[in-house]
Swiss-Prot record:
GO terms for molecular function: triose-phosphate isomerase activity. PROSITE patterns: TIM_1, TIM_2. InterPro entries: Aldolase_TIM, TIM_sf, TrioseP_Isoase_bac/euk, Triosephosphate_isomerase, Triosephosphate_isomerase_AS. It comes from the Eukaryota. One of its GO terms (biological process) is gluconeogenesis. It holds the Pfam family TIM. This is Triosephosphate isomerase. Belongs to the triosephosphate isomerase family.
Length: 206
């Protein structure tokens, strides 16, 4: 449960050099924030691209800040696939969330079909390019590489596969944004990460 997870994280020990953020469903955001120390962040799993208006059911970055949150996850593959969110919409959401003072975990990643067709880099670059068109300051952005075929399927990208994409993304940032951003930006891997494989994944340079 979220309560148990929060208690485990609160008890630690955690690496003081590693930023820990818990992303949970909207109804439990206040609960998580109340159970965790300030040193651990809480992220919503989605928000909308405008501050206010008639968007019944949507949550704005301002509302998330009212709950004491500092983070939001945007562009998750399920939002793209199930709810039809486009690269452009996700980029607009990222820009608005950043403008409102939130930190953003922006998700990218290819499907199994795209990987088997040799399109992994093309898809990841396309998704990242849309975000880059809207972002001027990258200091509050984390890129999450989440191959769709490895999310909740039990299949995991090998550490080598993950590293290959992360390295390609850094090269893309160097060529299309700046070397400084490429060196500084955090790129994390998500997709069936377990206690058994996390050490090997974390050991990769990118």
């Amino acid at each position: 449960s979220i309560t148990e997870l929060c208690k485990t994280l609160s008890a630690g020990p955690l690496d003081p050099n590693t930023e820990v953020v818990v992303g949970c469903p909207a109804p439990y955001l206040s609960l998580a924030r109340s159970l965790l120390p300030e040193t651990i962040g809480v992220a919503a799993q989605n928000c909308y691209k405008v501050a206010k208006g008639a968007f019944t059911g949507e949550i704005s970055p301002a509302m998330l800040k009212d709950l004491g949150l500092g983070w939001v996850i945007l562009g998750h593959s399920e939002r793209r696939a199930i709810f039809g969110e486009t690269d452009e919409l996700i980029a607009e959401k990222v820009a608005h969330a950043l403008g409102e003072g939130l930190k953003v975990i922006a998700c990218i990643g290819e499907t199994l079909q795209e990987r088997e067709a040799g399109q992994t880099e093309a898809v990841c670059f396309r998704q990242t390019k849309a975000i880059a068109a809207q972002v001027k300051d990258w200091s509050n952005v984390v890129i999450a590489y989440e191959p769709v075929w490895a999310i909740g399927t039990g299949k995991t990208a090998t550490p080598e596969q993950a590293q290959e994409v992360h390295a390609a993304l850094r090269k893309w940032f160097t060529e299309n944004v700046s070397a400084d951003v490429s060196n500084a930006i955090r790129i994390q891997y998500g997709g069936s990460v377990t206690a058994a494989n996390c050490r090997e994944l974390a050991g990769k340079p990118d």
